[in-house]
Amino acid sequence: DFPLLHRASFAVETAAPELLLAVLLCGSLYMPPTDSALSARNLFDLAEELAFRRLAVGLAAAERADGGGGEGPVSCPPRLYETLQAALIVHALQSTMRSSTARRRNRTVRLPALVSAVRVLGLAKTKHAVADLMMMAPEARWAQFVQAETRIRISTWTLLSDCQQSGVFHCPQLMTTLEMTGSLPCLPELWNAASHSELDQVICASGRDCLVRGASIRVAVETLMAENWDGPEAFPVKPLTLPDLQVLVFSIHSSMRNARFASILPAAAPVVARAIDRWQELWDLAARGLTAEELSRRGLVRHSGELCWLARVMLDVSMSEDAERSSAYLQGVAHDSLEELHAFLRVYCSLDD
């Protein structure tokens, strides 16, 4: 729902081979089920191995070039961003496979590698330095904006991948909203600008504040869970988009699961419940201008309202006395199949109906 790759600067001739392969295989999922499209899935393991080997090598080289690592984040060479993007795409592709071995490897080996890279490179702290950007020449401003936004999107994609794995397989999350102190992904019209002149036109039309968004993921989540609430109009993220709300509802889910895993959900439940209510209020306002057909064309973000419903159901069930007896999903931690989640949904969707 917010693209990971910057289309205007992506070049087949110069892109990293692992990124080209990842993009090609991702495209095969959207093709008609021809023999060639289906056979492309045989390359998923190869693409995974290539991307993550190059990520390990590139990260080690960056740390050596930075003096062996020490205080503060390691400088990231441009090529390493492409390797990280490739690894994220392949990680998402492998999550669609039916192999329990691939799922377990995705969760226990590949995801920790992604989270570690985000932390070593300090990506989750990245903010657009608006004052500095506006003093640059147009071409330099565009290049700097794209690089910072790429860092922001890589860290946000990693957080969402972690949330998704945690939710589907009921396992502790690796990343936290606490460390997401950088900027939110920018507005689509900025990311989709085809040139430096088009980017400047968008900034001129919308004002330089369009680069800032007002708050980080951490601040947004803390606002949803705070004791005081001044209503949607005082929410710090402006303008608030549907993809923003998708990130926030995933974060609410992760906060609820983390509280349950730490055996403090009874104390945290009122905080989570009011965050759900406030999120729903924001969603109703943000989505009210869209028809059902328009919302259906918005990718995975269209399911955010359903995720909010699911958060409410999971909170209620988790707080019940027979939570673990009534749900195989809640009984264990770190499942290797989707069956436990599917069984939970079958039971509680039917009860809700």
Model-predicted segments: where are they?
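Structural signature of alpha-solenoid helical repeat scaffolds
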Residues: 15, 78, 150, 298-300, ...
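An N-terminal domain-cap segment
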Residues: 2-14
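Acidic, Ser/Thr-rich, low-complexity intrinsically disordered regions in fungal proteins
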Residues: 17-20, 26-230, 284-291
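Start-of-helix signal in alpha-solenoid helical-repeat scaffolds, especially tetratricopeptide repeats
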Residues: 17, 21, 84, 152, ...
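Long, amphipathic alpha-helical regulatory blocks in the mid-to-C-terminal portion
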Residues: 1-3, 42-70, 116-128, 208-353
